[in-house]
Amino acid sequence: MLLDTLQTQFRHYFPTQRNFVLGLSGGIDSIVLLHLLAELQLNLRAVHIHHGLSPNADNWAAFCEQVCKRLKIPFILQKVTVDRSEGIEAGARAARYQAIGEIIQPNEVLVTAHHLDDQTETFLLALKRGSGIKGLSAMQAVGFWQNFTIFRPLLNVSKAQIEQYALQQQFTWIEDESNHDSHYDRNFLRNEVLPIVNQRWQHFSQMVARSAQHCAEQQMLLEELLAQELQRYADFSEKRLNIEAFPQFSLAKQQQLIRLWLEKCGAQMPSTAQLMQIIQQTIYADVDKNPQLKLADFWLRRYQHHLYLTGELLEPDDFCQPLFAQQSLTLPDGIGELQHLGDSIIYQKSGKIDRLLLPKVLVNAPLQVKLTHQGKVKQYAKPMREEMKKRYQQAQVPVWLRKRTPLIFFHDQLVFICH
């Protein structure tokens, strides 16, 4: 019985969790899961993502709403715009999860109706892309996407079992006409390839699932073995990786440490070619070079012996403001906030707080805040003027942050670089 299978999965993975959100497309898989979940008497909400890709999309949304109303399950409709630049399938998936991330609550878990046949397709698509063990792990019963947890309780259940249950219970569901279009890779596998494979090897999907599980276990072991070293070299709060020792490591170890660091920083995984480019242009670059590479929505930059992962950084317009005692100053473009406490300066940015003690003669003195300074500068209480570039280097301020780092002046003398 599917209900028994579902109850076993919930008891195993979420024995005390009560709040769930179901991703409801209206297709046979999610309709079956909706009815099963309704019997478990959970605190359940259902969300339907309206992609706007089909002329029938409005009808599908209305159907899902009616089914939820009949089962007395709260229903949410989210409309999204699909970015097709990476393909419709990838764009729709990204838009779907982004929308769910906006509505799901911190105490809720997303439930999806992925099943055994979906797992086989995902594994074969990863194989086609030349993925390593991380990609070949395919889907796990419990996964994560940015800020929420995903639970796939039907991952060991075949499509045939789901169809049989739906027919026995006389459920109704929608049929997405695009599922028959073998132009899409997943549909090609589902419609053209797997029926032939399953005729030859009856338990093919179960064997693929076993291989995916082996890959997942190997990936977990790899991460466990590298965890201490990653902790030694990575600063995740600053999205920074110390690569000074990396030339001594094997290429495989370099690749895995960089992949794990990028993943934990929330970056999209680079391809093998991109990863080799990162290694060649950053790890083996001269120490005085500052290479930078675009990686999806991020920039990967090197400064001295560190890699940094940053977003797109704007250079603010010329900024110069007074800062008086007992005054706060909000800096532009999310650069942070300064407070003059009289005897010290507090600099807050991204939850991090630094306190800079003022020299006694500057207690309660009026100061000035800039975000850039050209040419030479005189450090407070020092006789000689130095190039500002040298002061940045001494303070280890990366090149791309030098117009986003607050400079505290007393008259024309530099008191602090807030970094």
Curated annotation (Swiss-Prot):
GO terms for biological process: tRNA modification. GO terms for molecular function: ATP binding; tRNA(Ile)-lysidine synthase activity. Its EC number is 6.3.4.19. This is tRNA(Ile)-lysidine synthase. The gene is tilS. One of its GO terms (cellular component) is cytoplasm. The N-terminal region contains the highly conserved SGGXDS motif, predicted to be a P-loop motif involved in ATP binding. Pfam families: ATP_bind_3, TilS, TilS_C. It is an enzyme of class 6 (ligase). Keywords: ATP-binding, Cytoplasm, Ligase, Nucleotide-binding, tRNA processing. It comes from Actinobacillus pleuropneumoniae serotype 3 (strain JL03). It comes from the Bacteria. Belongs to the tRNA(Ile)-lysidine synthase family. ATP binds at S25, G26, G27, I28, D29, S30. Signal peptide: none annotated. It is found in: Cytoplasm. CDD domains: TilS_N. InterPro entries: Lysidine-tRNA-synth_C (IPR012796), Rossmann-like_a/b/a_fold (IPR014729), TilS/TtcA_N (IPR011063), tRNA_Ile_lys_synt (IPR012094), tRNA_Ile_lys_synt_N (IPR012795), tRNA_Ile_lys_synt_subst-bd (IPR015262). Ligates lysine onto the cytidine present at position 34 of the AUA codon-specific tRNA(Ile) that contains the anticodon CAU, in an ATP-dependent manner. Cytidine is converted to lysidine, thus changing the amino acid specificity of the tRNA from methionine to isoleucine. Its main location: cytoplasm. The keyword Ligase applies. NCBIfam families: lysidine_TilS_C, lysidine_TilS_N. It catalyses: cytidine(34) in tRNA(Ile2) + L-lysine + ATP = lysidine(34) in tRNA(Ile2) + AMP + diphosphate + H(+).
